[in-house]
Amino acid sequence: MENGFNEEAVDAAVAEAQTLGEEERWDEAHSLLLEALEEQGDTPLLLCWAGIAAQRLGSDSEAYDFFRRTLALGPEDPFVLATAGSGVALFDDPGAEGALRTAALVAPDFPFARAAYGAYLAREGLFAEAIGELEAARALAPGDAEVHADLAIAYLLAARQDDGVAALEEALSLRADDAWMRALYGLALLEARRGEEAAEQLHRAAAERVEDVELQLLSALASADQGWDDEAWNALARAEAAASAPDHELIEEVEDALQEGGDAPGALLRDDLAPSLLRERLLQKA
């Protein structure tokens, strides 16, 4: 027993939670970690992993509270600093920058720490510094799809279009089943005026993310712009099936463009919908 908690018990609880998480059993991991916190009290490692579990379950406010409490204990472990720092950064917490910078400084050979700090810097608009951190992370972990994706996002936010597209291609070569990343790739291809390739990628991503209304509408317009009428109307139908009330106005606008035909779908796609959604999703991921 040290510092009021049993270190072996904490490590065992975290190891079990990690195993459950790898099996996508995050609800069980969450319950296990709450029990461990009740038994052992607040420790940075337990709080951090409780934050991870809450985040995976979509409980963002609960995750933020766990990550905030983690940092309040002054952790030194770079994984804990980088994870909790990234977690509170999503809520613009002023403690994020210090935690992420410290993690990258104390563990310069730890790719997750470098990538987490780089992603934060990209979101803050410090693109040169962000790219430096993320390129360092890529050199340390060339087989990590997430690092390539984060670097791609920094490149695209910095208007380095070709580099961003290439980094997304590399990320997808490592994790081909990531439909969210594929949708981002399709948007980047649209920005690069590679319309047919973009339509193919958006169509493929939309077939997997059927509840993503915006993606269905992007796919509908991109398909129509290529003359793929059946694919366009099928994507619109999926959007209508998944839509909630705020989506209806945009759906009607896309439907009008499909009915008008000609240049209308491509114009709505390239001049309006795609640029705004690209930036929104880049910042969402960063």
What is the role of each PLM region?
Residues 23-31, 57-69, 88-102, 124-136, ...:
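Structural signature of tandem alpha-helical TPR/SEL1-like repeats
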Residues 41, 75, 108, 142, ...:
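Short coil turns that delineate tetratricopeptide repeat
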Residues 1-12, 38:
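TPR-adjacent "capping" and linker segments in tetratricopeptide-repeat scaffold/adaptor proteins
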Residues 21, 48, 55, 88-89, ...:
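Position-specific recognition of the canonical hydrophobic site in helix A of tetratricopeptide repeat
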Residues 179, 183-187, 191-286:
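Eukaryotic alpha-helical solenoid repeat scaffolds
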Residues 4, 34-38, 68-72, 101-106, ...:
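Conserved structural position within tetratricopeptide repeats
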Residues 49, 83-84, 116, 150, ...:
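Canonical tetratricopeptide repeat
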